[in-house]
Amino acid sequence: EPGPSSDLTTLTTKFAAKGLTPSDLTVLSGGHTIGQSECQFFKTRIYNDTNIDTNFATSRQANCPFSAGGETNLAPLDSLTPNRFDNNYYKDLVSNRGLLHSDQVLFNGGSQDTLVRTYSTNNVKFFSDFAAAIVKMSKISPLTGIAGEIRKNCRVIN
């Protein structure tokens, strides 16, 4: 699976291996509009990346010290509306406020910039494309019969 420090080439290659397009990658990454990440996964970005809003980096550094400690401290993946499914994740990217390196590479002068900008201004298109990509992803090598299970709680095996 792709990691939080992956570059765009790595991400698109890993998604392509599952039959997903770069556009699928970009829209599915929008799932990060909800959720959090531990400091250990974004520390390098907030102290070393140059494509990051300075005020954003400083605010995240307050809860994620450069020296040892705080590795499990959490920060929201969507700084604007972390508990609402919307397109603000993309607004963060356009403002160089992506928490993970692997998020910000979607908007960094590369092939996905136009789509990120579109989603940042068009919530309806994001919702529609996200739904279609989720359905597409659900068809990737599904486990059937006794090999798979439908969980009532994703974290607990039935």
From Swiss-Prot:
Disulfide bonds join C39-C64. It holds the Pfam family peroxidase. It catalyses: 2 a phenolic donor + H2O2 = 2 a phenolic radical donor + 2 H2O. Removal of H(2)O(2), oxidation of toxic reductants, biosynthesis and degradation of lignin, suberization, auxin catabolism, response to environmental stresses such as wounding, pathogen attack and oxidative stress. These functions might be dependent on each isozyme/isoform in each plant tissue. GO terms for biological process: hydrogen peroxide catabolic process; response to oxidative stress. Glycans are attached at N48. Its cofactor is Ca(2+); heme b. This is Peroxidase. GO terms for molecular function: heme binding; lactoperoxidase activity; metal ion binding. It comes from Lupinus polyphyllus (Large-leaved lupine).
